[in-house]
Structures are given as C-alpha cells and as structure tokens.
C-alpha cells in the first residue's frame, strides 16, 4: 500500500483552498483522503474540530475577503456570548457580512450586506467581526422559532454578558463593550428589524450579571413587578466579603441561582453549603433557585409569592 503523503507542516492543522492545492504539492487524489474534511465547497481542512465555532471560522477564512467580517450570532458566539441552543449548534451556518452592495453566497454561509463604516473588531481569538454591540443589534432580527419573551431574555442575557465580561475559572474577562457603545449601536440601528425589542432590552441590561440564568431570573421578577434586586452587593460574612447573585439589602434578603455545575461538582456543592450558611449567620434570608424553579409555572409563582412576603 502506498503511504499517504504528509501535508505541509503549516497545513497539518488548518485549511486551504482546493484551487491552491497544487501550490502546496497536494494532488487531487490526496485531497480525497480520509484525513481531510470539506467544511465548505472548495475548502479542505485537516486537524480542525469543525464542531467548534472558532475552528470552523478559521476554515472559512480561506475564502473570505479582507474587508469581510463575521456578523450576527456568529460574531456574538466568537465573543463568548450565551446564545440560545439553536444558534450555537455545531455546524450551524456562519453569518458573514460584506461591505457594499453584494453579499457572500455559499453553502454553510448566510451572507449579509454591511453598511460602509460598520465598526469592526478582532475577537479574543483574532477573528475579524463586526463590533459586538453591532452584532447584538443584528441578532435581534434572528428570531428563528423564539417567542417574544424568549427573544427578549436572549437579547438581555447577551447584553449582560457583553457589558460585564465572562467569568472563567474564577476570573472575569474584560467586557466586550460598554453600555454607552450598546446605546450608540441601537441609535445607529435606527428603525431596523427588532428596533423596539432592542430598546426594551437596552433598558433591562445590567452590569455584573454572571450567567444567562441569572438574567432569566431577574426578568422573571421584572415581569412579576417585584422590586428590582441589587446586583453586586457585598455582604460581610465569617468567610469574608461575599457577593450574592441578587440582593435586597434593605430587607436582608438575597437570591442565589444554582446551576447543574453546583450540584455535579462535590467540592463546589460543599462550598455552596458553607456560603449559604455564612449568609444566614450574617442575618440574611437566602432563597436558592435552580433551573426547575424557572421552568415550572407553579414553582415560579411560589417563588414570587415568597419574595413578595419577605419584601413586604
């Protein structure tokens, strides 16, 4: 059996245009080998995880022009924004914006025309995107099958993340943009698709929110006309200063949202137990909320009733 010819070292983990394969000494038969994938027409890749957004975008750069940029939900994903599941699905079509009158047409790509002067940025991974605030406004037009309430929660959750920064391994990344940049982007968006919902989401975004579920919880309280909780309130405890997810300092009531990671990690579960006990010993009433509470109407109503009683 003839040994498979190795790829050039610089393509061992990357992508290339089939039209330029000959320049790299890659034959047509080599391009049909099992170790190469076809992420897009006219492109071959090796060693890339095409289910990963960043690596799929790197493969697409092979055919993109210098002035093009990732836009809409693709850009938001590259900035680490928490998107509804259907927008972050592996192998989902990439949104690519092109300045001027034309737009990119290719299987696996949704092309868009960008206005001249659309602000651009480099993502944390060095990929060219429209500015995160602009991508957020574009995302408002991507309704898919989301209801009005679901889309509003998604927009606010993304906005909270962009102006706060993601928390990873205990540290918080720098915010992708400022509240003022978000406001300016909405003004620039004008009366485009989703303008009314963007204005509402703009009024509801808050700095300091750590997760989309915390956003969902906060908006649940907003819809129920419960007083708005404080974000980022520091409580002195025997463990030192602790910051609950949401707090009502005047009533010494706080809310902690606990996702599955809190339950599945034994060390974290024990830490949560001590954290709650420290809050209680400091004289605070602690309400612990999980995903089931937000998904079930009866439990939602019970949570709201409990809060109203405590805040009365």
Spans of features found by a protein language model:
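Short gly/ser-rich loop at a beta-strand->alpha-helix junction or flexible surface loop bordering the NTP-binding
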Residues: 1-193, 312
